[in-house]
Swiss-Prot record:
The keyword Cytoplasm applies. S-adenosyl-L-methionine binds at T139, G163, D185, N232. Keywords: Cytoplasm, Methyltransferase, S-adenosyl-L-methionine, Transferase. GO terms for biological process: methylation. It catalyses: L-lysyl-[protein] + 3 S-adenosyl-L-methionine = N(6),N(6),N(6)-trimethyl-L-lysyl-[protein] + 3 S-adenosyl-L-homocysteine + 3 H(+). Pfam families: PrmA (PF06325). CDD domains: AdoMet_MTases (cd02440). Its EC number is 2.1.1.-. The lineage of its organism: Bacteria, Bacillati, Cyanobacteriota, Cyanophyceae, Oscillatoriophycideae. The keyword Ion transport does not apply. This is Ribosomal protein L11 methyltransferase.
Length: 298
């Protein structure tokens, strides 16, 4: 049964999606995908049978319930079944279709042929096991914010993408006109996915520089400072990094932050204010929000 995989299905409140993705990634799953069923989300993920016992799956189910209770959301329902390897390779992909985002962008799965008769910016993507297919509200909010921001900026900009996942935000930024993006993620699979998607979108590696690590590695990697930051990760991780944003950015820099539930917005805003950042706009979608912030130049 070495070629068999567990297909894990999590039925959950849509506002739990990012937390479930994070938990499945930490558990070791690959090829995550989401579809909407009524008022709920169904998240599918896959893990080799040889590495995972039934007790492990039961523990995963418990952790997912605990994660939901911490944010006062309904308990998710987790189920699993064994499938053959060839079924795994195609099963999750059939649920992911092209996604239009903002006024100018469309996310196209790598295994589909993109249109040639469109003025839209096409971001081709194969996320592998990394987070970021463009279907989650936080990813969409970040891309829409980037579209607005990079349309406003007449001068070439250099950005930092902290927690790059599949590379979707970095690639979107380059295709929207950013001159250079430095992308980091602590997960080596995310680093690999971002590099693969960089190649898929024919982006020069000198324009999108990808490394394993977090903000500390960026501070060592970047010669000088960046014009902007984009960061779509868990709110508590963002909170811990805010004090380091100043050293990373120029005096008139901006940042786009998401992965944040509405109920987490106030502590994030308070921490930003303590470190001389101004909230220019707070965009909301469902129970998620996206901070558009700038340095306080006064």
């Amino acid at each position: 049964m070495a070629n068999s995989w567990w297909e894990i299905q999590v039925l959950c409140d849509p506002n739990l999606e990012e937390s479930v993705f994070w938990r499945l990634d930490k558990f070791g799953c690959s090829g995550t995908a989401t579809e909407i069923k009524g008022q709920s989300s169904v998240i599918k993920a896959y893990i080799p049978q040889i590495t995972t016992q039934l007790l492990d799956l039961a523990a995963l189910s418990l952790w997912l319930i605990q994660d939901a209770l911490l944010v006062n959301l309904p308990r998710p329902i987790t189920r699993w079944r064994l499938i053959d390897e060839e079924d795994w390779a195609s099963s999750w992909k059939q649920h992911w279709q092209p996604t239009e985002i903002g006024d100018r962008m469309i996310i196209y799965p790598a295994w589909l042929t993109p249109p040639t008769d469109t003025d839209q910016i096409i971001i081709r993507l194969d996320p592998g096991s990394a987070f970021g297919t463009g279907t989650h509200a936080t990813t969409q909010l970040c891309l829409e914010s980037l579209e607005m921001r990079l349309t406003m900026d007449a001068e070439p900009v250099t950005l930092a993408d902290i927690g790059c996942g599949s590379g979707i935000l970095s690639i979107g930024a380059i295709l929207l006109g950013a001159q250079k993006v430095y992308a980091v993620d602590t997960d080596p699979l995310a680093v690999s996915a971002t590099r693969s998607n960089r190649h898929l979108n024919e982006i020069d590696p000198n324009h999108l520089i990808v490394n394993q690590g977090s903000i500390e590695q960026l501070l060592d990697l970047i010669p000088g400072q960046v014009d902007g930051i984009v960061c779509n990760i868990l709110a508590e991780v963002i909170m811990d990094m805010i004090p380091q944003f100043t050293a990373l950015t120029k005096p008139k820099s901006w940042a786009i932050l998401s992965g944040i539930l509405l109920e987490q917005a106030k502590p994030i805003a308070d921490t930003l204010e303590q470190h001389d950042w101004v909230v220019a706009a707070l965009w909301k979608r469902g129970d998620w929000c996206c901070f558009n912030i700038r340095k306080n130049s006064d």
